[in-house]
Swiss-Prot record:
Belongs to the RimM family. InterPro entries: PRC_barrel-like_sf (IPR011033), PRC_RimM (IPR056792), RimM (IPR011961), RimM_N (IPR002676), RimM_N_sf (IPR036976), Transl_B-barrel_sf (IPR009000). The PRC barrel domain binds ribosomal protein uS19. GO terms for biological process: ribosomal small subunit biogenesis; rRNA processing. This is Ribosome maturation factor RimM. It comes from Nitrosospira multiformis (strain ATCC 25196 / NCIMB 11849 / C 71). An accessory protein needed during the final step in the assembly of 30S ribosomal subunit, possibly for assembly of the head region. Essential for efficient processing of 16S rRNA. May be needed both before and after RbfA during the maturation of 16S rRNA. It has affinity for free ribosomal 30S subunits but not for 70S ribosomes.
Amino acid sequence: MVIMGRVAGPYAVAGWIKVFPYTEYVDGLLDYPDWWLGSEGGKWHKFKVIEGEVHGSVLLASLEQCADRDAAARLKGLKIAIPRRLLPALPESGEEGYYWSDLIGLAVINLQGEVLGKVAGLLETGANDVLQVQNPEETERLIPFIDQVIIKVDLAAGRITVDWGLDY
């Protein structure tokens, strides 16, 4: 499963949910008629998407098994995933060799070996993508996802090496 977003909570009273997508484009999840909701390391449950729409930087969606606000509220915090076999194939290496969701949770370490935190999300700014890096002190760093800064993405080791100082 590739985690593609997170349920932020209910939206309105008719059972709709608000979704924070982890996809390159806000509407990327709407390409899939079924979503799997659950938690990493836990069980995944298939939900049929009835309707969805972009609402600023989030998605609003109506799911077949979610008839009212109470049902939608019970989904808050769950991850949304798609089986990897249903996703487009990626090149073996390079910037396009992984999905954004593959980067979530990776440790971010600078060239001096200092741990900056873990990837909490990514932002699309138009000029370039930006890593949202959260550290244990609950502070957030925004690190540009550009060649001059991102030295290496090592999915197997679970880390991203960056040319970025602690004081930036």
